[in-house]
């Protein structure tokens, strides 16, 4: 915490540092009516050796999906996948996901990507499933480094503190390894997502990222090294994206004291959000989807006026993290994953939110023609596009209908 405080205390000097990167009025396809649809993808639905060592042989997050139960009146659980409990590390299963995504208008899978001081985690999703799928070139992909603490919430007991399993903070040496790895292994893939030729790479937890280096200047220098390595590999630049929020969710997350000064001062090229609830409090057990949408739009307006770099808006499918709770514990709004939920998140209301988001983007000539969606498969957080036995392909059909390409 001392190091973090020292980083934040230096932010007063950040305004003196020139901001690099793509300005809002230079963003990709700013005059197009076609919007690039990016879907986050959470890859914990396969067998991972670390998970099995901790949680038992054969464990994946599907176990939490299967074991979920209704926790209050009108609560629809468990969620049942229409395709069954697929193995995303199997290229055939991943090919099914790719075909479905492309058919319904998803252009990019933005994978939650994990790498800690002792190496990669959950990497089989991309390395074995996606990159070996026979149709992988139909869709683009990119990485969001999910550099948050990995804590024990699989499931979480109400009165037991979440044990820290893998710290999100890494050494500067580890970050250098990460830079080399992603450039060589992922950026050079022909279907890696690029903006104006620059590979897109997003960082999820900015306070944790700053802790890695101990000072603002050292953090900025690390980013510059990453950028220079990317250029040395033959790319015109790196498109570095920052995720930020005003409301921490997972234990260990923190907010930025001055996000604009930090994000722009460090030289990020764009900024975005991961999920609506990072900006909107869920004040009721069943908080209405349309109300959350409207509150998020207020945040979007604030972000657009505060940042001089492009803000990429988010559309969330829903929120219900109750499957990650110990099902025999009483349920209430006591802290993640014991949280209030989003209700009324029907495919029809999701479609309306998409249309409103599209209209807001197209009404702003400076806005990048990009939106992201949470999420392809956050089943245990109640925010997923994949078909289930209740709504079928409804959320995907909403994307297809609203985001028709010319």
Annotate each predicted stretch with a short phrase.
Residues 1-6:
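Positively charged n-region of N-terminal signal peptides that target proteins for export
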Residues 7-18:
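Bacterial N-terminal signal peptides
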Residues 20-24:
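Boundary at the C-terminal end of the N-terminal hydrophobic targeting segment
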Residues 26-406:
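Glycan-processing catalytic domains of CAZymes
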